[in-house]
């Protein structure tokens, strides 16, 4: 009886531990947010970084006018949607309580057609996100422009 209860508790606790990542993987808006805005360990953070990363992530057809990549720990970004690293910022937005390293890629020239050329701006700042079910799904780039 004790062994059966112990096994049940073990399976239950493992199930709890696996639930959040599974839910995150099942949220297409969260996956899209990560694809567009998350880069844990960037190489370079210069104009060439912007051009290659934007192209690799399919953000250049047509050329996207501006895009910001957030660097660092994914958990800290997700925590903005809760009280651990975020606070309300009007409407459904939340602002981080700690700054993040970011690279903002801004389109040079006026043509929305490839080849896209970008200018990189590196910085550290608090970021504003829109959240859905406790996960970031939108980076509000209108709040902070380079």
Swiss-Prot record:
InterPro entries: RNaseA, RNaseA-like_dom_sf, RNaseA_AS, RNaseA_domain. SMART domains: RNAse_Pc. Residues 1-24 form the signal peptide. PROSITE patterns: RNASE_PANCREATIC. Disulfide bonds join 50-105, 63-116, 81-131. Secreted ribonuclease that can either promote or restrict cell proliferation of target cells, depending on the context. Endocytosed in target cells via its receptor PLXNB2 and translocates to the cytoplasm or nucleus. Under stress conditions, localizes to the cytoplasm and promotes the assembly of stress granules (SGs): specifically cleaves a subset of tRNAs within anticodon loops to produce tRNA-derived stress-induced fragments (tiRNAs), resulting in translation repression and inhibition of cell proliferation. tiRNas also prevent formation of apoptosome, thereby promoting cell survival. This is Angiogenin. It comes from Macaca mulatta. The gene is ANG.
């Amino acid at each position: 009886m004790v062994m059966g209860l112990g096994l049940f508790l073990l399976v239950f606790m493992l199930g709890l531990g696996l639930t959040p990542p599974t839910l995150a993987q099942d949220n297409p808006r969260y996956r899209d947010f990560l694809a567009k805005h998350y880069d844990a360990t960037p190489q370079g953070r210069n104009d060439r970084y912007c051009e290659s990363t934007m192209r690799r992530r399919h953000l250049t057809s047509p050329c996207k006018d501006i895009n910001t990549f957030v660097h660092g720990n994914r958990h800290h970004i997700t925590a903005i949607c809760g009280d651990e690293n975020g606070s309300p910022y009007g409407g459904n937005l939340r602002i981080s309580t700690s700054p993040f390293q970011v690279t903002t890629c801004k389109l040079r020239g006026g043509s929305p057609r490839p080849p896209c050329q970008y200018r990189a701006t590196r910085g550290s700042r608090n970021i504003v996100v829109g959240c859905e079910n406790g996960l970031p799904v939108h980076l509000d780039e209108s709040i902070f422009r380079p």
